[in-house]
């Protein structure tokens, strides 16, 4: 059996990044050398100082985008499966609410509505989680240790849980304010949803329809 040819998509992306960054760095060095000279006219010095500032911002953005791409690629499959699971739970919760609304008591209806809201927040959390960060799972495969062996491990678990609660609280407010930048119903119907910004980092994202596509786009970055 012939050996499969490894994909060069990742390396090609890295090559483009390295090439673009190298050009920007060269321009920065050239301008810095020019500005070190004593005989540069004032107007030319001002123009080049402005250009230097703009180039440094461009380089910083490019470096951040590259870092974000690497993190997003690492966790996009986890996010995909968690999105599917969250949507499945939401479908079940809405179906249960419909059934209870027809035959149940008021307290049962109220409880079912709370479950639906909880599931909607889960869906929004997965979709809007900042791609520049290590993804914090809603449904981890293993239970966290109750008694971590080291102080560092304990602090790490506490930090992760604190960040999860912080992000989920922000998503909860968006859901309650009906301010989500996408339609949950569209996701439930298997439609592609274009999210221009996540709720924290401002990075552009494209969220694929979970029922129809498995590969999530990674070219949403600034």
Curated annotation (Swiss-Prot):
GO terms for biological process: maturation of SSU-rRNA from tricistronic rRNA transcript (SSU-rRNA, 5.8S rRNA, LSU-rRNA). Keywords: Coiled coil, Nucleus, rRNA processing. Residues 47-108, 149-180 form a coiled coil. Signal peptide: none annotated. Residues 143-164, 199-215 have a biased composition (Basic and acidic residues). Residues 140-166, 199-222 are annotated as: Disordered. It holds the Pfam family Efg1. It is found in: Nucleus, Nucleolus. It comes from the Eukaryota. The keyword Ligase does not apply. InterPro entries: Efg1 (IPR019310), EFG1_rRNA-proc (IPR050786). Its main location: nucleus. One of its GO terms (cellular component) is nucleolus. PANTHER family: RRNA-PROCESSING PROTEIN EFG1. Belongs to the EFG1 family. Involved in rRNA processing. This is rRNA-processing protein EFG1.
